[in-house]
Amino acid sequence: MRRELLTLIAMLLLEAGMAHAGIMTNVNQSAGFVRMPARNATLGIDGVHYNPAGLTRLTNGWHFSLNNQFVFSDRQVENDYSYLNGAPSAMFPADANAALFPGFFAAYKINKTALSFGFNPIGGIGGTDYRRGLPAFEMIFSDLVPALQPAFGVTGYSVEMAFKETSASFGYQLGVSHEINPTLSLFGGGRLVRVKRTYRGGINDILINPTTGYDGSYRRADVFAAQNGASFTSKSQSYSSAAAGVQSLISAGAGNFTLAQVQSAGYISSAQRAQYESALANLGLSPAQIAALRMNQVHTYYEDAATYYAANADLMAGIQWLTGDRELDVTQTGAGFAPILGLNLNLARNWTVAVKYEFATRLELENDTRVDQFGSYPDGANVRSDLPAMLSLGVSYSGKSRCVFSSGLNYYFDRSANYGLVNAAGEAVDNSDIIDANSFELAAGAEYSLNKSLLLSAGYMLGKTGVSEDFQSLIRFSLDSHTVGFGGQYLITPNIALNIGCSFIRYREDGKEYDHYQAVPTVLPFGSSSDTAAPARVTDTYSRSDMILAVGIDYIIR
């Protein structure tokens, strides 16, 4: 049992580690994006990230932009497994907030050439705090109730769990933009991505409330299992010794005798007969049944009892191991590089068309394992966690009015990226089995200049994920999204601009149905049927909502 549970727990923790893998490229890299998400054809300083080829349209001199975002993310999984606390609608909330989400851009423009640098959280920053713990773990511990109910009358459980993941994936981008002619500009560069992730937490104080032979108060499950395991071991040894004694009587020719006949024949004393009868009564046999038994049958009962108690002693050892306190403290680090190409077209003075292609970033993270009492993160082991290649397109139009209209597309090549995902057997999973299509985002927005100093903006972005139901899990899920952003820009001086933005992101609720097999075998009374319990049909419902506040300062040295 312990091997199976160890494999299950290890897979759950590895899956938790993959919560930051895949579908994680961030596009909210500036306050300008937060206030108007269609930035792919921007000709501003945040074009370092969104439209680097368009930097040739900047005025000569140094251009800088410093941004920060405050990200508030609320995630929740609802699970209807009947033994979970809170069933049939057990809620598992998780907070993923970031008070620091910085972005810095710098560009030096001289005539037809611009040199640029960008520093951004490309693959995620902040932490996810599982306030109730990991739901997949709690399902395991809730299975203590059906496992121990028949023999011990257990009706409830409790567990203290706390897990927190943090992720910091910073990108350092360098590149050169050059104007080929007044219409066409090109960009070539690359981005170094450095990643650090941590997984810390623990499981403590797993309690159950046995009522059969106990007072129904909650007590530590590991202590309970240790005590009953020792009792089962002692009983197994006693019945094994008794079976050996009965075998000697059978060998002496008393196999077809009853206990009364064995005593009358002088094979055993009245006290020994009482011990044999007491041992059979403890197995649930009535006096009439005991009186009718032949010694061959008594031997069978004793052997079966010895096997039964030995098996339950092993089961209790597994429960003791499962319900002991555990801690986890792991850090993963790694780095990767991706080339970036860009193109900008200025058409008919009013139209801008931009194209950018980012190659996939190959990321291999190494475990630095300080504490791992789950056996999931071997120290020094490596795991892949790539960032997918991305193609972005943008179009903007600025007519004679004070409005600029923009639209954009981001297309992620998820199916060809190596996210390091594995199945329950620890084998690599092909993306085609869990990702039906590449994900994409469509955006549209507008900016309106009230006067020479103040600009207002708003926009919308639709995010479509391409994952299949098999990708979704209690820990890692990807959902379609709707983003609305608004804000403005204020020119403090001709060379200093303040950007302020706010975005609300709503995700489409999704769900998954699957069979849950009881993780802990049932302890049954002696002689009961040991048929395997049918799996329970379980439904998970995933939901999420985000809010982003952003502020940025743009500065020009002419």
Where are these predicted regions, by residue range?
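N-terminal, post-signal peptide beta-strand-biased segments of exported outer-membrane/organellar beta-barrel
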Residues: 17-126, 477, 503
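Residues that define the transmembrane beta-barrel architecture of outer-membrane proteins
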Residues: 46, 97-102, 168-172, 335-339, ...
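Residue-level signature of outer-membrane beta-barrel architecture
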Residues: 56, 107-110, 174, 178, ...
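Repeated loop/turn-to-beta-strand initiation elements of outer-membrane beta-barrel proteins
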Residues: 62, 112-115, 183-186, 350-353, ...
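Transmembrane beta-barrel strands of outer-membrane/channel proteins
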Residues: 64-72, 117-121, 188-192, 355-359, ...
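Structural signature of outer-membrane beta-barrel domains
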Residues: 71-75, 120-126, 193-197, 358-364, ...
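Extracellular loop and loop/strand-boundary signature of outer-membrane beta-barrel proteins
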Residues: 87-92, 157-162, 324-330, 376-382, ...
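Outer-membrane beta-barrel "beta-signal"
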Residues: 488, 492, 543-558
